[in-house]
Amino acid sequence: MALNLLSPAEVKALSFLDSTKSTRFPKLCPGGITLHRKDCRVPLRRRVHCSLQQPPPAWPGRAIPEQDLCNWNVPKPISIIGSTGSIGTQTLDIVAENPDKFRIVGLAAGSNVTLLADQVKRFKPQIVAIRNESLIGELKEALADVEEMPEIIPGEQGVIEVARHPDAVTVVTGIVGCAGLQPTVAAIEAGKHIALANKETLIAGGPFILPLAHKHNIKILPADSEHSAIFQCIQGLPDGALRRIILTASGGAFRDWPVEKLKDVKVADALKHPNWSMGKKITVDSATLFNKGLEVIEAHYLFGADYDNIDIVIHPQSIIHSMIETQDSSVLAQLGWPDMRIPILYTMSWPDRIYCSEVTWPRLDLCKLGSLTFKSPDNKKYPSMNLAYSAGRAGGTMTGVLSAANEKAVEMFIDEKISYLEIFKVVELTCDKHRSEMVTSPSLDEIIHYDSWAREYATTSLKSSSSPRPVTA
């Protein structure tokens, strides 16, 4: 079986930022983002290194397991931020199947009182938080018959207390959006290792989070399938061996749709993912390919990869979860069924590998699968890639603004306030507006401020723009 991979720099875009102070970005031509493709026929004249800026030792590719992560003779104590969401419920499935390996210390949720109460009764945590403070009374009432009542703390402070509970060793961060940033900071400062399923933590807060993790000697272990795959592939590589990261994408709900048909997309269409079972927001992100654009930025921060050395390939079967290319042109890949439990389990058990019964964890059979296929992503169908690469190259607060604007746009689309194609327009307009205020090395307060600003601006961006820059479907 031959892997027909993308050549380096297959999908690149000019920045929408003002380039007057930089030689890296040509100025925009009127009418929006202009695409340029490198001439792939020109031979490589130098050895390609994955990054000019070395990542801190906290990055998982060079993480060395310490004694507190090895040889657990008792169940490892875990806290979950976002326990009622897709990541949280799958994490609890793993804990339920492996009670001798893991135990739950803390649970934090947003507003799903019924499910949270059921989780508390089953897993018996020591501390519980519900972010929606108005629901604290309802939660206490639902837990009135519990023999050992956990400590219950409402609001954002409650979520932070769950994240930094002294008994937890690892914190699984499954909250969608920038809401996961402050709990992650609290967990790192309290010395907890992070099982990171919240993309926005690094996309918005990478310049702040990584030095903080380095300072506290904390391991940030990726719990999404693509970055977990990269993490697994690069372990054991010597310094300087990594040449290129290749992120695979299913193509989402519209991978087989003609571009012309996208103007007719309904919410129900976007929520039909062909391979994965996920929450609404990430499923729409898979349809727009914004999830992959955000993952490019996350890979940059996690693995120190330069954007010129991070590529995307459409892989409809979602069996290869991502690949790396080494300096000698070898390609290493991690394969498995599309099951989020596998990368989640690995972040919880790392550096160990836990046996999983094939009754509940089907084993991969390539002979039965038959074939794996690959193709280049379509820039016209997925304008999100251009926006993400541009924001990533800009860095600073621009990546957080991109993420927040997309999150708000997806919310408006699901609520049927905007059309599918307007998701891309909202994000581009918001990023374009932010370019004059972008902060290159933001503080945590600035990251949070511009996250809030982006959501607010995105809400009215289509109305407030007198001459919006067009985004081709």
Swiss-Prot record:
Query: Domain of life of the organism in this record?
Result: Eukaryota
- Which family does the UniProt entry place this protein in? Belongs to the DXR family.
Which annotated residues bind Mn(2+)? 224, 226, 295
Put simply, this protein is called 1-deoxy-D-xylulose-5-phosphate reductoisomerase, chloroplastic
Q: Name one GO molecular function term.
A: NADPH binding
The reply on keyword Oxidoreductase is: yes
Provide the free-text tissue specificity comment from this protein's UniProt record: Mainly expressed in leaves, and, to a lower extent, in trichomes, roots, flowers and stems.
**EC class of this enzyme?**
oxidoreductase
What Pfam families has UniProt attached to this entry? DXP_redisom_C, DXP_reductoisom, DXPR_C
Tell me if ATP-binding is a UniProt keyword of this record: no
Regions that span the bilayer: none
Q: Which EC number applies?
A: 1.1.1.267
- Record's catalysed reaction(s): 2-C-methyl-D-erythritol 4-phosphate + NADP(+) = 1-deoxy-D-xylulose 5-phosphate + NADPH + H(+)
Note the InterPro entries from the entry: DXP_reductoisomerase (IPR003821), DXP_reductoisomerase_C (IPR013644), DXP_reductoisomerase_N (IPR013512), DXPR_C (IPR026877), DXPR_C_sf (IPR036169), NAD(P)-bd_dom_sf (IPR036291)
What does this protein do, in the record's words? Answer: Enzyme of the plastid non-mevalonate pathway for isoprenoid biosynthesis that catalyzes the NADPH-dependent rearrangement and reduction of 1-deoxy-D-xylulose-5-phosphate (DXP) to 2-C-methyl-D-erythritol 4-phosphate (MEP). Required for chloroplast development.
The record's subcellular location field reads: Plastid, Chloroplast stroma
Gene3D superfamilies attached here? 1.10.1740.10, NAD(P)-binding Rossmann-like Domain (3.40.50.720)
Necessary cofactors: Mn(2+); Mg(2+)
Quick one: which pathway?
A: Isoprenoid biosynthesis; isopentenyl diphosphate biosynthesis via DXP pathway; isopentenyl diphosphate from 1-deoxy-D-xylulose 5-phosphate: step 1/6
- Span of chain positions assigned to the transit peptide in the UniProt entry: 1-49
Where along the chain is NADPH bound? 84-87, 110, 112, 198, 200, 279
This protein's GO cellular component annotations are: chloroplast stroma
